[in-house]
Amino acid sequence: MILEHVLVLSAYLFLLGLYGLIMSRNMVRALMCLELILNAVNMNLVTFSDFFDNSQLKGNIFCIFVIAIAAAEAAIGLAIVSSIYRNRKSTRINQSTLLNK
Protein backbone atom coordinates (compact mmCIF):
# COMPACT_ATOMS: atom_id res chain seq x y z
CA MET A 1 0.00 0.00 0.00
CA ILE A 2 1.25 3.48 -0.76
CA LEU A 3 2.51 5.44 2.23
CA GLU A 4 0.69 8.65 1.35
CA HIS A 5 -2.70 6.92 1.13
CA VAL A 6 -2.36 5.42 4.58
CA LEU A 7 -1.16 8.72 6.03
CA VAL A 8 -4.10 10.59 4.51
CA LEU A 9 -6.53 8.00 5.88
CA SER A 10 -4.88 8.17 9.28
CA ALA A 11 -4.98 11.97 9.29
CA TYR A 12 -8.66 11.86 8.31
CA LEU A 13 -9.44 9.45 11.17
CA PHE A 14 -7.45 11.58 13.61
CA LEU A 15 -9.19 14.80 12.57
CA LEU A 16 -12.60 13.12 12.63
CA GLY A 17 -11.94 11.89 16.16
CA LEU A 18 -10.60 15.28 17.25
CA TYR A 19 -13.63 17.07 15.82
CA GLY A 20 -15.97 14.63 17.53
CA LEU A 21 -14.09 14.97 20.81
CA ILE A 22 -14.33 18.75 20.71
CA MET A 23 -17.94 18.96 19.55
CA SER A 24 -19.53 16.06 21.42
CA ARG A 25 -21.62 16.64 24.51
CA ASN A 26 -22.15 12.97 25.29
CA MET A 27 -19.54 11.09 27.32
CA VAL A 28 -19.93 7.83 25.40
CA ARG A 29 -19.50 9.62 22.07
CA ALA A 30 -16.40 11.36 23.45
CA LEU A 31 -14.93 7.97 24.41
CA MET A 32 -15.63 6.64 20.92
CA CYS A 33 -13.91 9.65 19.36
CA LEU A 34 -10.92 9.12 21.63
CA GLU A 35 -10.74 5.53 20.37
CA LEU A 36 -10.74 6.86 16.78
CA ILE A 37 -7.76 9.04 17.62
CA LEU A 38 -5.89 6.10 19.15
CA ASN A 39 -6.64 3.93 16.10
CA ALA A 40 -5.26 6.64 13.81
CA VAL A 41 -2.07 6.68 15.89
CA ASN A 42 -1.89 2.88 15.63
CA MET A 43 -2.20 3.08 11.86
CA ASN A 44 0.75 5.49 11.78
CA LEU A 45 2.84 3.26 14.04
CA VAL A 46 2.31 0.17 11.92
CA THR A 47 2.75 2.05 8.64
CA PHE A 48 6.01 3.74 9.60
CA SER A 49 7.34 0.55 11.16
CA ASP A 50 6.61 -1.38 7.98
CA PHE A 51 7.82 1.32 5.62
CA PHE A 52 11.10 2.33 7.26
CA ASP A 53 12.27 -0.80 9.09
CA ASN A 54 10.70 -3.93 7.68
CA SER A 55 12.99 -6.34 9.55
CA GLN A 56 11.92 -5.32 13.07
CA LEU A 57 8.48 -5.30 14.62
CA LYS A 58 8.88 -2.42 17.09
CA GLY A 59 5.95 -0.44 15.69
CA ASN A 60 3.68 -3.48 15.70
CA ILE A 61 4.59 -4.39 19.28
CA PHE A 62 4.04 -0.81 20.42
CA CYS A 63 0.69 -0.86 18.60
CA ILE A 64 -0.35 -3.91 20.64
CA PHE A 65 0.53 -2.04 23.84
CA VAL A 66 -1.53 0.95 22.71
CA ILE A 67 -4.49 -1.34 21.96
CA ALA A 68 -4.22 -2.88 25.45
CA ILE A 69 -4.07 0.54 27.08
CA ALA A 70 -7.02 1.72 24.96
CA ALA A 71 -9.07 -1.29 26.05
CA ALA A 72 -8.35 -0.55 29.70
CA GLU A 73 -9.16 3.13 29.15
CA ALA A 74 -12.46 2.23 27.49
CA ALA A 75 -13.42 -0.15 30.30
CA ILE A 76 -12.63 2.39 33.01
CA GLY A 77 -14.31 5.19 31.06
CA LEU A 78 -17.49 3.20 30.51
CA ALA A 79 -17.56 2.22 34.19
CA ILE A 80 -17.31 5.89 35.16
CA VAL A 81 -20.00 6.85 32.64
CA SER A 82 -22.37 4.15 33.91
CA SER A 83 -21.79 5.28 37.50
CA ILE A 84 -22.48 8.91 36.57
CA TYR A 85 -25.61 7.84 34.68
CA ARG A 86 -26.88 5.89 37.69
CA ASN A 87 -26.44 8.90 39.96
CA ARG A 88 -27.29 11.80 37.62
CA LYS A 89 -29.55 10.16 34.99
CA SER A 90 -27.58 11.94 32.27
CA THR A 91 -24.37 11.36 30.33
CA ARG A 92 -24.09 14.87 28.94
CA ILE A 93 -20.72 16.46 29.60
CA ASN A 94 -21.98 20.00 30.16
CA GLN A 95 -24.57 18.89 32.75
CA SER A 96 -22.14 16.95 34.91
CA THR A 97 -20.86 18.97 37.86
CA LEU A 98 -19.44 15.97 39.68
CA LEU A 99 -15.83 17.18 39.48
CA ASN A 100 -16.58 20.78 40.49
CA LYS A 101 -17.24 19.99 44.16
From Swiss-Prot:
| DNA-binding is among the record's keywords | no
The superkingdom listed in its UniProt entry is Eukaryota
The UniProt record lists the keyword Transport: yes
Q: Give the UniProt record's GO annotations in the biological process aspect.
A: ATP synthesis coupled electron transport; photosynthesis, light reaction
Q: Name one GO molecular function term.
A: oxidoreductase activity, acting on NAD(P)H, quinone or similar compound as acceptor
Q: Which InterPro entries match?
A: NADH_UbQ_OxRdtase_chain4L/K, NUOK/Mnh_C1-like
Residues crossing the lipid bilayer are 2-22, 32-52, 61-81
Provide the protein's localization: Plastid, Chloroplast thylakoid membrane
Q: Which Pfam families match?
A: Oxidored_q2 (PF00420)
Q: What is its main location?
A: plastid
Catalytic activity reads:
a plastoquinone + NADH + (n+1) H(+)(in) = a plastoquinol + NAD(+) + n H(+)(out); a plastoquinone + NADPH + (n+1) H(+)(in) = a plastoquinol + NADP(+) + n H(+)(out)
What keywords are assigned to this protein? Answer: Chloroplast, Membrane, NAD, NADP, Plastid, Plastoquinone, Quinone, Thylakoid, Translocase, Transmembrane, Transmembrane helix, Transport
What membrane topology is annotated for this entry?
Answer: Multi-pass membrane protein
Known EC number: 7.1.1.-
One GO CC annotation: chloroplast thylakoid membrane
Give the quaternary structure: NDH is composed of at least 16 different subunits, 5 of which are encoded in the nucleus.
Alphabetized HAMAP family for the sequence: NDH1_NuoK
Q: Which family does it belong to?
A: Belongs to the complex I subunit 4L family.
Provide the function of this protein. NDH shuttles electrons from NAD(P)H:plastoquinone, via FMN and iron-sulfur (Fe-S) centers, to quinones in the photosynthetic chain and possibly in a chloroplast respiratory chain. The immediate electron acceptor for the enzyme in this species is believed to be plastoquinone. Couples the redox reaction to proton translocation, and thus conserves the redox energy in a proton gradient.
User: What is this protein's record name?
Assistant: NAD(P)H-quinone oxidoreductase subunit 4L, chloroplastic
Report the gene name.
Answer: ndhE
